[in-house]
Amino acid sequence: METSPSEMRLVQRYVALGDSFTAGAPGTPSEGRWPDYLAEALRAANPELEYHNLGQAGVTTAEVAGAQLAPCLGLDPDLVTVVCGANDVLLSVRPDIEAHATSLDYIFGKLRERLPDVALMTATTPQLSNHLDLRPRSRRRVEEGVIRLNEATREVALRHEVVCLEFADHPGARERENFGADGFHPSTTGIRRAAGAGVAALRQHFGIRTTQEVA
């Protein structure tokens, strides 16, 4: 049975951690990122919402842990999204998925330890090789790396009871319209659809009050 709107919880402080999927690709307007749409849906229910996007383009999961986690903890949020790992694959000729898993485990562990009541959400990574212009050897490396990355993300999320949005297995992951000109970063359509999935998950898994849909 779905929780009635009057019984749903309000988010007071939302912090978004991650790479360019959170921070926005270079040139992306600061109000056009998927956490921005998520915050907009939350603010419709609670106009007093505080929203902090700490994401940075080009960072690995270890760099998220090293540079973004401490400021996040200092803000004492009741909702945190952590979406990262793509750069662990794209920026290395030998993707170190164990390093990603170790860093993600550390992030989730610290958040659970310091903020036991926080709502935590992460996501898998769409198959980046689908739309990137890559040579065969690089395509295999990226394809295999993303598969292993997502396996690790799911495993760590499950261990820490973190809701994991399935962007990797979503039919939209193969639709070109959901990606920008570079074939890597999401398009405006893709961003809005990702935010819509996030809003639905907040309502379903946490009983968090939002607008019904992303505007």
For each predicted feature, which ranges?
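Serine-esterase "nucleophile elbow" of acetyl-processing enzymes
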Residues: 1-57, 67-76
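Flexible, active-site-adjacent loop/turn segments at secondary-structure boundaries
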Residues: 19, 32, 62, 177, ...
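Ser/Thr-centric signal marking residues that sit
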Residues: 22, 60-61, 81, 124
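Short N-terminal helix/helix-N-cap motif within the alpha/beta-hydrolase-1
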Residues: 25-26, 62, 91
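Alpha-helical cap/lid subdomain in secreted, periplasmic
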Residues: 46, 66-215
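Short, flexible loop segments at the rims of nucleotide/cofactor-binding pockets, characterized by
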Residues: 56-61, 141-142
